[in-house]
Amino acid sequence: MSKLQKRLLLTKVKQNRTLSLEHLFSREVKFNMAVSIATSFRTSAKSTSISHNNRTVNDPLKNDKYHKHIDWDKTDKNIILVQRPIKEVYDENFGEAVTQYNAKQKRTDRQVKNYFEKVKKDKTLDLQREFIVQFGDKGLCEEYPDTREAFAFQLEKYADWFRQQFPDLKIYNAVIHMDEATPHLHMNVVPVATGYKQGITKRPSFSKWFKNNEIDFKQFREMQVEKLDELVQEMGAVRKIVGTHEYEKPS
């Protein structure tokens, strides 16, 4: 069992010792166990669109093929959890390591002037990664309209759990879309990996982050699925098995 898995297990044990059934307040929805809810956890190494996620696209683009599925009248109901400039996150997490690296360079042409731009050109590193998390589907939300708020609340809880359990996956943007057929979470993170003996000692690398935490991408995915299953059970339902969760192995 890896260090990360042990920490997650310890956290779960502590929660089980003290947790009484949580009330979802105005967003509480309790299903009969016969109801099954599909969950989805997807990611890829492709570039993201923060303007799409934050709904800051220009008016002419709102009706193009990439945005026609959005109900713009409901966009004000979207829930912004985190919204930070990615360059700010880079400065905060890698700035000191870059400064230390530059101080050791005898030639100024070897110094790194802009680490963010350097990473963008480096195929061995990960500028960022986006996760998309969802409960239910369009049919379920139409059959049980109250589930939209309940799913949003569970997505907030998932994002908070993720932030606490994976502190070196720095969330710089997270928003729950309520203006589409099914509520879902877009969460963008920057992986912070340490342990490099040469060059810059901290770098954005998922493969190195996995190595630091003694897990692989499959185990990481299983942790997410287990948490989503737990959140489904909190609503008195069971997770619907609809196939494998999409996960693209980090490069």
Question: Which role does the model predict for each range below?
Answer:
Residues M1-S251:
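N-terminal nicking endonuclease/strand-transfer module with a His-rich metal-binding environment
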